[in-house]
Amino acid sequence: MSQNYYLTKIQEEFAQLHADGLKKANCKKIPLYGCVLNGELMEMPKPDLTLRDPVNFVMKKDGAVASKFVKTGLVDYEEKTFRYYATPRAGNPHACKSLTKRSQNDLASQLRYDKVYVEKYPDPADRGMVVHPRFGEYMQGFPRDWTDPEVAMVNPLKVYPHPRLKAIDLFSGIGGLTLAADKFLESVAYCDIDADARAVLNARMKDGSIDTAPIYEDIKKLDATKIEADVVIGGFPCQDLSTMGKRKGFEGQKSVLFYEAMRIAKECNAKAIILENVKGLLNCGGNEVFFQIRDELSSNGYDYKYVVVEAAHAGAVHHRARVFFLALRRDLIPKDIELGLRTPLDTKHNPFWTEQPIPAVEERMVMKGNKKADARMKQIGNVVCPLQGELAMRVLIPSL
């Protein structure tokens, strides 16, 4: 669909609503001020300021007077609740206070008029994500500019059989990355030094949520030469890399266990390595840690790509940016392809856009101060969110 299609559709729908007297008693919830499209001001009813109001954005274009609007609005109309999508970017609503030129061009595609019943889920955290088919294509590895009509006839969201590769799951914790990888990998061994974490893994194996496999305690004593595995995955300790700590890098005693993960990968001659850690890894020690990881992978015959994923953009109710590395053994990579993504992926600064602007992902509102969510986060600690890991793997795994 073209940008003009969405613009025309939106204008028609709004015109009809106004013609039906939406400004009057029929409207109870309209947290939407208005927006500028192609230099024209589209007026909206004033919001009910007693409702929770997401962050307002300001956009200026073609000399038009700046006008404010919020990212999502709910409208009660004829005993139904409709939802307007007005997300300037598919990222953190706090990350962009003014729209860039690219975002202005994408705006018409993001303003959707969609009949979504939300009375059942008044809390934004309980609403599901909306994934557009073209976004599904992208997540399955299709190029962004893919237009082959024969391929387009195939349902892009169809699930095709894919053999699960065998994986050694290091620093398993309570299974966050394990659950994320379940659709793609079969865990044949786990390893975590924390007794409580091992107890959780045992419970997960009993209820069938993860694969049944031996659990090892000390990674330094793990002999991977006796384990048949294709992939090594793990979120190695972040305490020496996080901005919340002293950031000693690999000079510390915990994050240096990255090298143990590399030892295990070499012992089992892994085809691929998937690593997870805090985003602070990328600039720790003036990028020194990142360069050390790069050099270690390269010297052992691996090429790599990485993605940065914000948990909230994967559908979680909390903010947590994590970096995911995928390294492939160099001898397994065809010479005529480029490993990994066409472009670097960072869900905060590079939302998922295609060549033609289309609706992509419904961003959930992340609520600070939610007591229930805060309590849950304290209980599970600093673990990787399965939704977050799965999103990264859906981007990375097609390379396998």
Regions found by a protein language model. Name each.
Residues 160-165, 228:
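Short helix-loop-beta connector
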Residues 236:
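Glycine-rich, N-terminal phosphate-binding loop of Rossmann-like dinucleotide-binding domains
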Residues 6-17, 22-29, 34-37, 41-50, ...:
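C-terminal substrate-recognition regions of SAM-dependent nucleic acid methyltransferases
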Residues 156, 184, 206-207, 248-252, ...:
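Glycine-rich, phosphate-binding/catalytic loops in enzymes
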Residues 1-161:
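Feature marking protein-protein/ligand interface regions
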Residues 179-183, 203, 263-266, 295, ...:
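Short, well-ordered alpha-helices that flank and scaffold nucleotide-derived cofactor binding pockets
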Residues 167-220:
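SAM cofactor-binding core of SAM-dependent methyltransferases
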Residues 221-231, 239-386:
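Class I S-adenosyl-L-methionine
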